């Protein structure tokens, strides 16, 4: 989904891929999709170990005036913190940098990762869920608290969304009908659109595009 979003962007931009050594495979996949992109990898020390870091000079004079798109592929919180800090330092009135990842994971949510930097970089990723709108969905939240005496967790909301979605689909026909499970729906925090895989399982392939902004 995030790749399709970037491909559909008609604005002129330069593209870059930054990854640690464990994520070289996905970096190479992105490179094949965007052959003009430039790859950067985390530094290796004298012992041959991945330091999971870059330094300012590694990226100095890299970015151009206008829009620069950077894919960051890693599962290491320290690398996210390191790279987002360096990228943030290059942003100015003429150089714009937007940060993307094809694999949003806990590394991007660590205590050492600056949300201010991610906002400045307009960090974007695909997700099957989003945060509930406490204003728009106040009625549901109030009713939940009234019944259970605590604010609904993401697990409670997901359980509600999945159950409600399945009941609606069942009421409209056979779940094995591709015209039924192929319809996209969304509720408080979750979006659903199912597709049968080659192994026979039915997978949820719906995504939100999440973007960090000020």
Explain the meaning of each model-derived region.
Residues 1-214:
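Extracytosolic ligand-binding ectodomains
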């Amino acid at each position: 989904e995030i790749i399709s979003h970037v491909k559909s962007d008609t604005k002129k931009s330069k593209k870059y891929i930054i990854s640690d050594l464990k994520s070289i495979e996905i970096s190479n996949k992105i490179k094949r999709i965007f052959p003009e992109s430039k790859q950067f990898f985390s530094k290796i020390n004298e012992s041959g170990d991945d330091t999971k870091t870059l330094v300012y000079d590694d990226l100095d004079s890299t970015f151009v005036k206008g829009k620069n798109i950077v894919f960051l592929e890693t599962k290491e919180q320290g690398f996210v913190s390191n790279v987002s800090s360096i990228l943030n330092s290059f942003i100015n009135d003429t150089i714009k940098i937007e940060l993307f990842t094809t694999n949003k994971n806990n590394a991007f949510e660590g205590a050492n990762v600056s949300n201010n930097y991610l906002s400045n970089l307009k960090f974007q990723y695909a997700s099957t869920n989003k945060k509930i709108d406490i204003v728009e969905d106040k009625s549901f939240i109030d009713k939940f608290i009234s019944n259970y005496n605590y604010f609904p967790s993401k697990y409670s909301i997901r359980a509600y969304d999945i159950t409600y979605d399945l009941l609606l689909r069942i009421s409209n026909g056979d779940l094995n009908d591709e015209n039924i499970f192929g319809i996209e729906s969304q509720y408080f925090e979750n979006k659903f659109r199912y597709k049968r895989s080659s192994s026979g399982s039915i997978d949820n392939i719906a995504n939100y595009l999440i973007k960090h902004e000020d």
